[in-house]
């Protein structure tokens, strides 16, 4: 991992979106291959306690820190956010979210080219231990349904 550029985290938007100082301006970054429950959705019904937990964890871990970005595939999404794996102190924070059960391994837009095995294993362990979303039967059902859908949409790419 090249540490050529480190970016300062200016603001944590929610569990899987942060804003950083990127080449002199504020840019939002959507963390790749993770999807934490909503905490900041305009439709309040979408916001759930586990989303708040994920957002608070990201806040505690990343706010004010310098992070590395690693891109894979497209650099921006349709909302103009950068798409990247975020590393803090050399650790893949996307992997950490999956390890802690704060996010499933999010494959709606394809699998990770580089971290597929690690992400799968982290999710398997988190599920086995009933961590985070996997400790809530309703959320588990929801994510298992979504994951089978994602599997189909990823194949259709």
For each feature predicted by the language model, list its residue ranges.
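Small beta-barrel nucleic-acid-binding modules, primarily SNase/OB-fold domains
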Residues: 1-157
